[in-house]
């Protein structure tokens, strides 16, 4: 909806000073120059998942695997950074993840008059069989909004960020672990405990934990894991893709995950 608004209504009425678009394309296209700063905020779901496919084939049923219903993804419509357009692609992220699920579920339960009134989209599809994505794209979104506000106020565009790598069929290129290559990399991708993906389980993405032997080989102690996450978090702060306060939430998460090292 906001993509269509910014691309059509904004051109004529010029009501807004900038746009933050956290969505896939509309009719296979993104937003071009509309005279104000536009920041496209993209997860794997918009690149190689259900939101990349709205014109690649109709999604008939959101409760069964996407791959059984639709054609391969379309070419990404966002293009290179240019003029008043910036694109942030968050590797490993999904459109709707664990942190957002916790927030929206609490809100929906509070507002619902009965359990039956809680929206079904808050339930991960049963076919998935994996936990919800844990990347925490909302933490990166906070930095993106910060940069957009500065851009609107000062006229200085934020630096370009690396894009997620795609093959000739517009599929995400993955490393030996199954993690997306390129893109903005949060601590769960730079210091992983498992595979976060945004192209599975419709909007929710997925998280598949590494074997405990693999985790201990990567991080022999809890402190070594905390150190790896802290280094990744501070690197993201330096790159401008996390605010310091949001970066420290990843460190707190790492400090709380001590169970892997019990008895070590």
Name every feature range the model reports, one short phrase each:
Residues 1-264:
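C-terminal His-loop and adjacent cap/lid subdomain of alpha/beta-hydrolase
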């Amino acid at each position: 909806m906001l993509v269509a608004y910014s691309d059509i209504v904004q051109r004529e009425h010029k009501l807004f000073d900038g746009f933050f678009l956290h969505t896939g394309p509309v009719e296979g296209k993104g937003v071009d120059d509309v005279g104000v700063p536009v920041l496209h905020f993209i997860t794997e779901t918009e690149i190689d998942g259900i939101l990349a496919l709205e014109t690649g084939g109709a999604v008939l049923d959101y409760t069964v695997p996407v791959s059984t219903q639709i054609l391969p993804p379309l070419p990404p419509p966002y293009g290179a950074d240019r003029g008043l357009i910036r694109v942030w692609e968050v590797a490993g992220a999904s459109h709707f993840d664990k942190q957002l699920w916790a927030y929206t579920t609490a809100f929906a339960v509070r507002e619902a008059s009965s359990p039956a009134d809680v929206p079904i989209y808050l339930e991960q599809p049963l076919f998935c069989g994996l936990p919800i994505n844990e990347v925490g794209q909302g933490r990166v979104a906070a930095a993106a909004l910060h940069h957009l506000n500065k851009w609107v106020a000062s006229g200085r565009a934020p630096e370009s960020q690396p894009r997620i790598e795609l093959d000739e069929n517009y599929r995400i290129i993955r490393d030996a672990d199954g993690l997306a290559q390129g893109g903005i990399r949060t601590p769960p991708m730079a210091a992983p405990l498992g595979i976060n993906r945004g192209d599975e389980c419709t909007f929710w993405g997925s998280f598949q934990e590494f074997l405990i032997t693999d985790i201990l080989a990567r991080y022999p102690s809890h402190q070594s894991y905390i150190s790896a996450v802290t280094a990744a978090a501070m690197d993201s702060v330096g790159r401008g893709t996390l605010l310091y306060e949001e970066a420290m939430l990843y460190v707190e998460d790492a400090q709380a995950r001590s169970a892997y090292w019990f008895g070590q």
